[in-house]
Amino acid sequence: MPPPAPRITIHDLTMAYGSFVIQHDLTFSIAPGEIFIIMGGSGCGKSTLLRHLIGLMRPATGDILYDGASFWAATPADRERMLRRFGVLYQSGALWSSMTLAENIALPLGEYTDLSPREIREVVALKLALVGLAGFEDFYPAEISGGMRKRAGLARAMALDPDILFFDEPSAGLDPLSSRRLDDLILEIRDSLGATVVVVTHELASIFTIGDSGVFLDPETKTMLAVGDPKTLRDTSPEPKIRSFLRRGEAETTTAA
C-alpha cells in the first residue's frame, strides 16, 4: 500500500529578512497524523520557519503546499480557507489576560462560526475538558499556573477543530513534570483527533517522546542537514552537529528514548 500523500510539502524554500538569508534550499514533507519536530541550535531559524508555515511570512523563494495546494499561489479566499485548518499554540500561550478561559476559547468560535451562544458554551466546555481544565471556564489566565495556561492555549488552538496544529516551544518555562504532562497531552490529542502536529522545540525529552520525524536546521551553513526520526538521527547520523545536539545530557534523557 503506497504511503499517504504529504499533508505539508516544503519545496526549495529560502527564508530571508530582506537580503539577509536565514535558511535556504529547504525541501521536506510532513505526513498526515505525524508529529514533526523543527529542531536545531539557537538562531537557526526554527521559529522563522514556523511563521512561514502558518502564513505570517512569505518565502523569499520556493513554495509551501498543503495537501498538494500551493499556499502563496492560491487566491486570498483559498488562503483564508487553508488558515482555518490551522491551530497555533504560541510560546507565551497568547491568551487575552482580560478574558476568562471560556471567553478566550469562545473568541474564534464567535468570529468564524455560526454557532449559537449555547453551542459555543458547549464547545468551550468540551475543549477545556480535553486538556484537563473542566470547571475552569471562569478563571482568568493570571489565576492559573503556567502549565495550565499552556493547556488553555492548546484548547483555544483546537477551538475550530483544525487538522494541523503548530506549537512554538510548548514546554518553554515549564518544570519537567508539567512539560511531560504537556507532551502526553499532545500525543493524546494527535491519537484521538488524527491531527498533524508541527512542533518547534529544543527540549530533548520532548523531541524523543513525541517526535515521529523532524528536520534539523543548521545556523552556520543556513540550510537543513537532515530529515528523519530523531532517535535514528541521534544514533546513526554521520553529521557531528546532529549527534552533538541530540546527545546533549544523554544520561538524563535515556529513559525518554
Ranges and model annotations:
Residues Y140-I144, M148:
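Conserved ABC ATPase signature
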Residues L165-D168:
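Catalytic Walker B motif of ABC-type/P-loop ATPase nucleotide-binding domains
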Residues G62-F71:
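Conserved ABC transporter NBD signature motif
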Residues P117-F136:
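Conserved ABC ATPase "signature" region
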Residues A159-D163:
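A short, proline-enriched helix->beta-strand linker immediately N-terminal to the Walker B motif
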Residues I54:
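Helix-to-loop junction immediately C-terminal to a conserved catalytic motif
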